[in-house]
């Protein structure tokens, strides 16, 4: 078995070794948070593999929290949108978060955020100095992150082949995958792959809503496209997505529901994994206080600060006070509220090494917002979860966590101290959740090739072959009536109706002839 794996690894990676020289690769990250972290990891992996990588990113913005920065071995090109745009964009995004966390989220608020992203994209495309510099670099490949449509337009403007990385759930973007609606849940449906009759009805109807939303979201970039692309060469975003040579998906079937894929679609869930380091001594000392009881890790992601919502903050703090475990809570509070007494078993920190803590032998539970990177890290280390999904793909992610039985979720609007404490105790006391999380970890780790090897191997394959046309089905070039066999259906329907009409005519003629023959016989 080990010999087979070595042969498979050599056969997959050898073409990359045979490349005559390192490729020049541009990675583009226009938003921050977990999206930036994933693109940073991709850039570093490819740089370590021997390619010359340059990352283009926006210095700061509403998506860009303060991260603990590390020295980069790849080149970074940063730019800034005008100050007035940044201020207005931040207001829009803060309003989006406030409304969403308050249970008043609307699709129009998301469209407003996308409109600011489109305007930010226009500001960048107007930067002739940067665009000329990128063109002069003559990159071999561009790698885009898909939360924002702008990287697709930049790649198109540069005229270079590009690879897309989807950092969130599958269904949040339509890029040509088959969607059998009987068992592949549509994004936002909150369904599993096991649907009853009414579930399939809901899924079928929501598919049309999903398609309409995609059109509305893409339309926010219409003005940007008209401004920066000449008539006759203006890309259609839905078509531009299909031009990607490869699609890397930040997921794994240890977490996601099984579904059909295309040859140019590659799972790389677990890409964020790094060698485990000892946790900082102050955290180790805190963990040691609770002995065999262990500790609970709490973080609600990089874009949301729980301390900004006092009610959520108080309910969570009260829930943690009921636990015998210690609680390490990532909560960026410059000042702890004077009217709230911090639970004795809780330690709050502005920053923490999440992966290292998830790998700690004393961890008992992970309380998470349900972000894709966080869930994949928890699965890697076999840690069960309680999810408090906030927005975006997070509710869909927690549906999968619950379906796979390595965690439960609580709706934000129903978050109460008693409910949260009960859920946490349920997960820690019922060993089936831990067993399911460990089983998922085994699935994730037992691939013949690691996520890094898959990423590097497939990119080297595309670089060597000059593209991935051989991996793309002809359906991408077919008109919609051919894709769905409507022309065949109309032909067969016409043939059937024509045959029935002809049979009816012949039958009528036969009846007329028989009647005529009878009258002749009677006379």
From Swiss-Prot:
InterPro entries assigned: UDP-glycosyltransferase, UDP_glucos_trans, UDP_glycos_trans_CS
Known glycosylation sites: 52
Cytoplasmic face residues: 505-523
GO cellular component: UDP-N-acetylglucosamine transferase complex
Catalytic activity: glucuronate acceptor + UDP-alpha-D-glucuronate = acceptor beta-D-glucuronoside + UDP + H(+)
Annotated signal sequence range: 1-22
Keyword set, alphabetical order: Glycoprotein, Glycosyltransferase, Membrane, Signal, Transferase, Transmembrane, Transmembrane helix
Location(s) in or outside the cell: Membrane
Stretches that traverse the bilayer: 484-504
Family, as annotated: Belongs to the UDP-glycosyltransferase family.
UniProt-recorded name of the protein: UDP-glucuronosyltransferase 3A2
Gene designation per UniProt: UGT3A2
């Amino acid at each position: 078995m080990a010999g087979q794996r070595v042969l498979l690894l050599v056969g997959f990676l050898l073409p990359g070794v045979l490349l005559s020289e390192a490729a020049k690769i541009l990675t583009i990250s226009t938003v921050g948070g977990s999206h930036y972290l994933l693109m940073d990891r991709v850039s570093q992996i490819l740089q370590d593999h021997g390619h010359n990588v340059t990352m283009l990113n926006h210095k700061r913005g509403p998506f860009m929290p303060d991260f603990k920065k590390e020295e980069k071995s790849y080149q970074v090109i940063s730019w800034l949108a005008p100050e007035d745009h940044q201020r207005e964009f931040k207001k829009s995004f803060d309003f989006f978060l406030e409304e969403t966390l308050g249970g008043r989220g609307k699709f129009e608020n998301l469209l407003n955020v996308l409109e600011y992203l489109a305007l930010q994209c226009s500001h960048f495309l107007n930067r002739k100095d940067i665009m000329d510099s990128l063109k002069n670099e003559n990159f071999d490949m561009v790698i885009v992150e898909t939360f924002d449509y702008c990287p697709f337009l930049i790649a198109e403007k540069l005229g270079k082949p590009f690879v897309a990385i989807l950092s969130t759930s599958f269904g949040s973007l339509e890029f040509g995958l088959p969607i059998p609606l009987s068992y592949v849940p549509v994004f936002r449906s909150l369904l599993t792959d096991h649907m009853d009759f009414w579930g399939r009805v809901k899924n079928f109807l929501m598919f049309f809503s999903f398609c309409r939303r995609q059109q509305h979201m893409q339309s926010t970039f219409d003005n940007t496209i008209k401004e920066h692309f000449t008539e006759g060469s203006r890309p259609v975003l839905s078509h531009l997505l299909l031009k990607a040579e490869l699609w890397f998906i930040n997921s794994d079937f240890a977490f996601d529901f099984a579904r059909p894929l295309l040859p140019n679609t590659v799972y790389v869930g677990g890409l964020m994994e790094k060698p485990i380091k000892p946790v900082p001594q102050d955290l180790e000392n805190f963990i040691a206080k609770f002995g065999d009881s262990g500790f609970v890790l709490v973080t609600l992601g990089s874009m949301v600060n729980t301390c900004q919502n006092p009610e959520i903050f108080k309910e969570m703090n009260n829930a943690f006070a009921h636990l015998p475990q210690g609680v390490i809570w990532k909560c960026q509070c410059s000042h702890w509220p004077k009217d709230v007494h911090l639970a004795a078993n809780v330690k709050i920190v502005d920053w923490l090494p999440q992966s290292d803590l998830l790998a700690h032998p004393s961890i008992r539970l992970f309380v998470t917002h349900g972000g894709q990177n966080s869930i994949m890290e928890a699965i890697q280390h076999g840690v069960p979860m309680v999810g408090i999904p906030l927005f975006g793909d997070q509710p869909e992610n927690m549906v999968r966590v619950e379906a796979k039985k390595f965690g439960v979720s609580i709706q934000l609007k129903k978050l109460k101290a008693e409910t949260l404490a009960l859920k946490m105790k349920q997960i820690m006391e019922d060993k089936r959740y831990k067993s399911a999380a460990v089983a998922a970890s085994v699935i994730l780790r037992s691939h013949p090739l690691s996520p890094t090897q898959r990423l590097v191997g497939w990119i080297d394959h595309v670089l060597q072959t000059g593209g991935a046309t051989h991996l793309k089905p002809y359906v991408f070039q077919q008109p919609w009536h051919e894709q769905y066999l409507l022309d065949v259906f109309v032909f067969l329907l016409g043939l059937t109706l024509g045959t029935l009409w002809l049979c009816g005519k012949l039958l009528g003629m036969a009846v007329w002839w028989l009647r005529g023959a009878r009258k002749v016989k009677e006379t």
